Amino acid sequence: MFNKFKKLISLVFATVLLTSISNTSFAADKLHFVIGGGAGGGWDGTARGTGEALTKAGFLNSASFENMSGGGGGKALSYMINTKPSDTILVQSTPLVLRSITRHSGYVDKKNAAKVTSYKDVVPIAGVIGDYGAFVAAKNSPYNSWKDVVAAYKANPKSVKMAGGSVRGSMDHLIGALAFKEAGANPNDVVYIPYDAGGKALAGLLSGETQIISTGLGELMGARDQVRIIGITAPDRVADAPDAPTLKEQGYDVQFVNWRGFFGPPGMSNKDKKAIAKMLGDVQKTPEWEAVRARNAWVNIYNPDKKFVKFLKTQTKEMTALMKKLGVI
């Protein structure tokens, strides 16, 4: 399902690219990634994987990372808005769009609405990847498929506790709610246990605190020896995880891909924004990036600059419809 990547970018091309970027105030030899969740989560993996590819492919000399958990990504977002750090980008995904929806829908009371930040408060640089939703159970679980989970839930709704790597109303929660709704259950009755990123959610599953996890497929690729993937939200099986069954093939037509991308602080120059966006696009043509992409089963979805803004506006409408469908707003 993935396009074959192009020939390796020559060292000469990379040198020319770095030279062109160095003419901006963006320091092309380094980049700092702010991550709004804990270790082992989708944001964490996307930031570190992108930084790894950029350095190994020669686009950067160094990449540094800072996990700033809190408020479902809100703490990191506020940090970017209030401090406006240089040479720093924020990794974000669909939850940032959800913030925009909650600000304008009355989901947050009027007194606190002004405190709700969204993608409009930072500078969209580029969307880079898509990650399908995935549901997993422990290896020793009686659940071998999503149908098994649905049957257990219908027999006793409280017996199935679903973990996720963020707060209620986050993508992990919404994708899980969507899958249960497709199975004929009331999504608001599902017991959802929030954790600080996918790593802790996985620990909760393995300890028996929860029965299933709703998360991104990429977050599970490194833990496949510990868990059983019982359903993913892709339209077809994914080449990088061929043993993972889709919900669709099990009779539940739930399809969703969670985008992830990068944002700059308010006031970032247009020149810097375009330079970083170009770099994020060019690295996707390298074998270093392909190695990172394949091990995470990501989909390349490159939307730079204005295309990214257009995409965010469109998804705001789509996510508003989804949240209304699920009764969240």
Model-identified regions with their sequence ranges:
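N-terminal (or domain-start) structured segment
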Residues: 26-121, 168, 183-214, 219, ...
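C-terminal segment of classical bacterial N-terminal signal peptides
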Residues: 16-25
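An extracytoplasmic/periplasmic, membrane-proximal ligand-sensing/linker region
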Residues: 28, 270-329
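Hydrophobic/aromatic residues within well-ordered alpha-helical segments
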Residues: 46, 50, 171-175, 312-315
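Bacterial N-terminal signal peptides that target proteins for export
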Residues: 1-12
